[in-house]
Amino acid sequence: MSHLVGLVRAVQANYYRVRLREPSNGVEELLCVRRARLKKMGQQVCVGDWVVVSHPDWPGQRGAIAEILPRRNQLSRPAIANVDQILLLFALADPPADVHPITRFLLTAEGLNVEIQVVFTKADLVSPQEQQQWRDRLQQWGYRCHVLSLTQGIAWQALRPHLANKITVVCGPSGVGKSSLIRHLTPREDIRVGAVSDHWHRGRHTTRHVELFPLAEGGWIADTPGFNQPELPPDPRQLAAAFPEIRQRLSQDQCLFDNCRHDQEPGCCVRGNWERYPLYIEYLHQLETIASAEPSLAKVPLVKAKSDRQGQQRLEPLLDAKKYRRRSRRQQHQHVNPMAEEVLDSEW
């Protein structure tokens, strides 16, 4: 029997909805569990993973995930794999656009090495002049952006060609219209949409878990549970590469020192009067402070390589010797003898 390969469409508790690449026996999707072997090896199954399914129960439409195929990339929070592009949504008003959170989301997306699309929503709440100002601003940063209004039906259909045949992840702060956009793009009626809080001027987030929704033009789109403070790159040396403005300057010139931090070093070609440079310096100092305070911790391996009779290597879970190793006969006798002595002592 050939292997069944499918795409993990949703994860809830310990169950995974897997859409089969090729439907079989009239079944397109299986509700699966993760094999214990994968759990012992510490391999987490993410939405967006391509997996091998074993032991299908066609009448019950169930199965077990036996293997996770190699990933091209992975978004850590929330966990979603094999992303083709990031759709970053920000509101022009209610809540108003802010350079700081926009930049932090962009830095997170840059770390994935995938295409980035920037979308501004609620265009009906600001003037055309302000809409154009943000378009020009993003262009100076190195990004193209779309401006739309879901309530007025402005320009959202123009997004469809950019989503075809791709796995697209929709990210952004709460209350900017992520769930509303997905509801416009997909036929699903069970996507919850919430209003912005009148007191906090922030969104009441309605997405509870990560899920891929199919698009009519092919491809998948995922809403993500909101996170208001996306993470900066873990290594300060990676920060500069996440700014298109810095990449553009380094492509035209070079700094005097190869290890230039683009801060106070002489002969730096990056330092200058561009809008987000103060943000770069602020984030650089934050990361350097964190890096100097945290000692490097070596990760304990969870798997070991073992060769079979054909000489092919396969991975097996590396079990805790103290927990799983069987006692030798000598150890068993050593354990039994003191017990026997205690019995003899009690008889006397």
UniProtKB/Swiss-Prot annotation:
Enzymatic class: hydrolase
Coiled coil: none
Main location: cytoplasm
Listed cofactors: Zn(2+)
Gene Ontology biological-process entries: ribosomal small subunit biogenesis
Record's keyword terms, sorted: Cytoplasm, GTP-binding, Hydrolase, Metal-binding, Nucleotide-binding, Ribosome biogenesis, RNA-binding, rRNA-binding, Zinc
Enzyme Commission code(s) on record: 3.6.1.-
UniProt GO MF annotations: GTP binding; GTPase activity; metal ion binding; rRNA binding
SUPFAM superfamilies, sorted: Nucleic acid-binding proteins (SSF50249), P-loop containing nucleoside triphosphate hydrolases (SSF52540)
CDD domains given in the database record: YjeQ_EngC
Xref: InterPro entries: G_CP_dom, NA-bd_OB-fold, P-loop_NTPase, Ribosome_biogen_GTPase_RsgA, RsgA_GTPase_dom
Biased composition (Basic and acidic residues): 305-322
Domain CP-type G residues, every copy: 72-230
PANTHER family in the cross-refs: SMALL RIBOSOMAL SUBUNIT BIOGENESIS GTPASE RSGA (PTHR32120), SMALL RIBOSOMAL SUBUNIT BIOGENESIS GTPASE RSGA 1, MITOCHONDRIAL-RELATED (PTHR32120:SF11)
HAMAP family on file: GTPase_RsgA
Record's function text: One of several proteins that assist in the late maturation steps of the functional core of the 30S ribosomal subunit. Helps release RbfA from mature subunits. May play a role in the assembly of ribosomal proteins into the subunit. Circularly permuted GTPase that catalyzes slow GTP hydrolysis, GTPase activity is stimulated by the 30S ribosomal subunit.
Subunit structure of this chain's protein: Monomer. Associates with 30S ribosomal subunit, binds 16S rRNA.
Protein name: Small ribosomal subunit biogenesis GTPase RsgA
